């Protein structure tokens, strides 16, 4: 019997012009019609997902929009190819579990 529930999530990556930044694209809307940028961990309160991403020691900033997340790593970090599998697996599991990406109320309250 096929188990029904949360959909299977796939994540692929796209390079950006900045070699320290990588775009992770999901087959699911994450933040429809909006975007939010977290320059550092202290700004990530409105996003449980961003808070979790900042637990990776090499993550410098997080940008969440429509169906993608753009991550910037610290320049001292290993090559993206060394950390992409870990990030992809984390995002896949996080999204398949149906966890909250952005808390809308906190995001609105955090706007300047």
Question: Where do the PLM segments sit?
Answer:
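Short glycine/threonine-rich beta-strand-turn micro-motifs
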Residues: 67-76, 80
């Amino acid at each position: 019997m096929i188990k029904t529930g949360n959909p299977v999530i796939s994540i692929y990556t796209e390079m950006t012009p900045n070699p320290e930044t990588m775009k992770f694209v999901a087959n699911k809307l994450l933040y429809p019609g909006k975007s939010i940028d977290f320059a550092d961990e202290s700004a990530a309160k409105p996003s449980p997902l961003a808070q979790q991403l900042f637990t990776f020691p090499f993550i410098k900033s997080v940008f969440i929009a429509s169906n993608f997340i753009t991550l910037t790593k610290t320049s001292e970090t290993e090559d993206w190819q060394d950390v992409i599998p870990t990030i992809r697996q984390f995002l896949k599991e996080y999204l398949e579990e149906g966890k909250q990406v952005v808390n809308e109320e906190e995001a609105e309250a955090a706007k300047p």
